[in-house]
UniProtKB/Swiss-Prot annotation:
The keyword Signal applies. CDD domains: Pseudoazurin. It comes from Alcaligenes faecalis. Its cofactor is Cu cation. Residues 28-116 form the Plastocyanin-like domain. PROSITE patterns: COPPER_BLUE. Residues 1-23 form the signal peptide. This is Pseudoazurin. GO terms for cellular component: periplasmic space. The keyword S-adenosyl-L-methionine does not apply. Binds 1 copper ion per subunit. It is found in: Periplasm. Keywords: Copper, Electron transport, Metal-binding, Periplasm, Signal, Transport.
Length: 146
């Protein structure tokens, strides 16, 4: 009986150690011009699981990534990268994260990260006040994800 308990404990420890190895890294490029127009994240819709990392890469100069106030899951920490620097975000909280390029937000440069299934805060993000061009691009991003 004791050997069985030890084997289960060892299996549990191995499973916990292997979990980070299963995490995915998703690259997102920050571009002056992309398939969807000017000032874009590609992809603009990112599907991730808790524990995954999202690496934002400023392919063109002048970009960063920043969380938008009240448009990330409850319990998630806000973040902001420096201009022209790669930024690695580990997503831990399930839900939707709306992010922006700070200098180009007024031009609609946003991306949506959906962590887990059916992000609970997506309706809140969609209905929140934001510039018209941002709302239009967000609606396109959501439609492309379906």
């Amino acid at each position: 009986m004791r050997n069985i308990a030890i084997k289960f404990a060892a299996a549990g420890i191995l499973a916990m150690l292997a979990a980070p190895a299963l995490a995915e890294n998703i690259e997102v490029h920050m571009l002056n011009k992309g398939a969807e127009g000017a000032m874009v994240f590609e992809p603009a819709y990112i599907k991730a699981n808790p524990g995954d990392t999202v690496t934002f890469i400023p392919v063109d100069k002048g970009h960063n990534v920043e969380s938008i106030k009240d448009m990330i899951p409850e319990g998630a920490e806000k973040f902001k990268s420096k201009i022209n620097e790669n930024y690695v975000l580990t997503v831990t909280q399930p839900g939707a994260y709306l992010v922006k390029c700070t200098p180009h937000y007024a031009m609609g440069m946003i991306a949506l990260i959906a962590v887990g299934d059916s992000p609970a805060n997506l309706d809140q993000i969609v209905s929140a006040k934001k510039p018209k061009i941002v709302q239009e691009r967000l609606e396109k991003v959501i439609a492309s994800a379906k």
